[in-house]
C-alpha cells in the first residue's frame, strides 16, 4: 500500500492534498481507538476498505485508550474535535474502525449530523458491490439483514436512503422495512434458498469425488494475488483489481498438471482482520469448499510489512472452518518486487503470479502433494469413531466397505500420511 503523508492539526490527521474533490465521491473521516500495534494495521486496512467502497478519505482521528465509550465510541473531548472537523471539512460520513451498536450509531449521527458507517457495515457494503452470482447476492443480503436487525433504532435514518452511497447498498426500502418480523421472514426465506443451492453444491462435490478429480483451493489474505495466480495457472479470466475483495464469487477452473493429470482449481474470497461474523456465517457454504479441498494453496503477499500477522489471520479462519489440517502449500507471491528471493522448499514456493515466475515449480509441488505413493490398507472403525471414518472417506479412495456388529470395515487406497493418522484403526 502506498504510504500517505498526513499533517497534524490539533491531533487530527488531514491529507496533504486538499484540492477540491469530485462530489461523486463521499468525503470520509476515519475514526479509530488505538490500544495495540494491530489497531494501527487495521486502521491502514480501513483506509483501503473506504477507498474500495468509493470514498475519498479526507482525514483520520485516533484516540489512544483501552476501552470503548459505550455511548459514542470515543470520549466526549474527542467527539467535540470530530464534530468541528466534520463541519470544517464538509465531510459526508464518518467511518469507524470497529463494529458499533445501534445506540452508538444513533448517538454519533445525532451529535455529528452525518452518516455513520462502522467497519462491519463497510465490508458488507463492499461485498454488496462485488456480488455477481445469485448465491453471492443472497449471501450478502443475508449478512446485511442479520447485521441490521439488532440495529434498527440506530440505522433508522440510513434505511430511508438505502441504495445511495456507502453503507447503504443492498436491500432497498421495499425489502427492508423497519419491521423485525418482516426482516426475520426475509432471513428465513434467504436461508431456505441458500440451503437448496448448498444441496446442489454438495452434489457437485460428490460427483467430483466419485470421478476422483482432486480439488485445489486458493486461499489467502485479501489482495494477496489469488485471482492473478488462478489466471496465470489456468489461462482463465477471473476478475483482477488492486483493491480489497476484488473477488467475491468463487471461480473454479480446470488445471492440467505437468503429467497430464487434471485437477479443479478454485479461487475463494479473501480473508481480513475483523471479518464480520455474520458474513462468515452467510458465506459458510461457499467457504466450506475450502474444507473439502484436497489441497490448499495459501497465497501470501511477500512484500507486506505485516505478513506474519496476515498469515495468522488466514490460519485462524481455516481453523474455524475445520480446514487447518488440510494439506497446504505456502505460495509466497510478488517476488518480482524483492531484491533477494529465498530458495524455498516443497511446502514454501516463491513466485510472481503477475510475471509468471516460479509457476513450474509450483505445479510440480501440487502434483507431488496430490499424487503421493499410495497403498491399499484395511481399517476397522467402531461406530462411535465417525469422525475418523469420514476423514478416510474424504481423503482416501475407498475400494470396499462392510457394516457389522463390530463396526465399519473399510479397504481403501491411502497415502502414507493418511495411514499414519489412522494407524490405530488398521487391521491385518
From Swiss-Prot:
Protein name: GTPase HflX
Residues that hold Mg(2+) according to the record: 227, 247
Function: GTPase that associates with the 50S ribosomal subunit and may have a role during protein synthesis or ribosome biogenesis.
KW Nucleotide-binding (keyword) present: yes
Summary of subunit composition and partner proteins: Monomer. Associates with the 50S ribosomal subunit.
NCBIfam families with a match to the protein in the record: GTP_HflX
Keyword vocabulary terms for this entry: Cytoplasm, GTP-binding, Magnesium, Metal-binding, Nucleotide-binding
Recorded family membership: Belongs to the TRAFAC class OBG-HflX-like GTPase superfamily. HflX GTPase family.
Xref: PANTHER family: GTP-BINDING PROTEIN 6-RELATED, GTP-BINDING PROTEIN HFLX
InterPro entries per the UniProt record, alphabetical: G_HFLX_dom, GTP-bd, GTP-bd_M, GTPase_HflX, GTPase_HflX_N, GTPase_HflX_N_sf, P-loop_NTPase
HAMAP family reported for this sequence: GTPase_HflX
Amino acid at each position: 500500500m502506498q504510504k500517505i503523508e498526513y499533517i497534524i492539526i490539533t491531533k487530527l490527521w488531514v491529507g496533504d492534498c486538499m484540492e477540491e474533490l469530485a462530489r461523486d465521491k463521499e468525503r470520509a473521516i476515519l475514526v479509530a481507538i488505538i490500544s495495540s500495534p494491530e489497531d494501527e494495521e487495521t486502521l491502514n486496512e480501513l483506509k483501503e476498505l473506504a477507498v474500495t467502497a468509493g470514498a475519498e478519505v479526507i482525514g483520520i482521528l485516533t484516540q489512544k485508550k483501552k476501552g470503548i465509550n459505550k455511548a459514542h465510541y470515543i470520549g466526549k473531548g474527542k467527539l467535540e474535535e470530530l464534530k468541528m472537523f466534520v463541519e470544517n471539512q464538509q465531510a459526508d460520513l464518518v467511518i469507524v474502525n470497529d463494529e458499533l451498536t445501534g445506540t452508538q450509531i444513533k448517538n454519533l449521527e445525532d451529535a455529528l449530523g452525518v452518516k455513520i458507517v462502522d467497519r462491519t457495515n463497510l465490508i458488507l457494503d463492499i461485498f454488496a458491490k462485488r456480488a455477481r452470482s445469485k448465491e453471492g447476492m443472497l449471501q450478502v443480503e443475508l449478512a446485511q439483514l442479520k447485521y441490521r436487525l439488532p440495529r434498527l433504532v440506530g440505522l433508522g435514518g440510513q434505511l430511508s436512503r438505502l441504495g445511495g452511497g456507502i453503507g447503504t447498498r443492498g436491500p432497498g426500502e421495499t425489502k427492508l422495512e423497519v419491521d423485525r418480523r418482516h426482516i426475520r421472514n426475509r432471513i428465513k426465506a434467504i436461508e431456505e434458498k441458500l440451503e437448496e443451492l448448498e444441496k446442489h453444491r454438495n452434489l457437485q462435490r460428490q460427483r467430483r469425488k466419485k470421478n476422483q478429480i482432486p480439488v485445489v483451493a486458493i486461499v489467502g489474505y485479501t489482495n494477496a494475488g489469488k485471482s492473478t495466480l488462478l489466471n496465470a495457472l489456468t489461462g482463465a479470466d477471473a476478475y483482477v483489481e488492486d483493491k480489497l475483495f476484488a473477488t467475491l464469487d468463487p471461480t473454479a477452473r480446470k488445471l492440467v498438471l505437468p503429467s497430464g493429470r487434471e485437477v479443479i482449481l478454485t479461487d475463494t474470497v479473501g480473508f481480513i482482520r475483523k471479518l464480520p461474523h455474520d458474513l462468515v456465517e452467510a458465506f459458510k457454504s461457499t467457504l466450506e469448499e475450502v474444507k473439502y479441498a484436497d489441497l490448499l494453496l495459501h497465497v501470501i503477499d511477500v512484500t507486506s510489512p505485516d505478513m506474519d500477522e496476515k498469515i495468522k489471520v488466514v490460519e485462524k479462519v481455516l481453523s474455524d472452518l475445520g480446514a487447518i489440517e488440510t494439506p497446504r502449500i505456502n505460495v509466497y507471491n510478488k517476488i518480482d518486487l524483492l531484491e533477494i528471493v529465498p530458495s524455498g522448499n516443497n511446502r514454501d514456493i516463491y513466485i510472481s503470479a503477475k510475471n509468471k515466475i516460479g509457476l513450474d515449480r509450483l505445479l510440480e509441488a501440487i502434483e507431488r502433494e496430490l499424487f503421493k505413493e499410495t497403498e491399499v490398507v484395511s481399517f476397522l472403525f467402531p461406530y462411535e469413531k465417525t469422525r475418523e471414518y469420514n476423514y478416510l472417506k474424504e481423503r482416501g479412495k475407498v475400494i470396499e466397505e462392510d457394516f457389522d456388529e463390530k463396526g465399519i470395515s473399510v479397504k481403501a487406497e491411502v497415502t502414507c500420511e493418511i495411514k499414519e493418522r489412522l494407524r490405530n484403526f488398521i487391521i491385518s
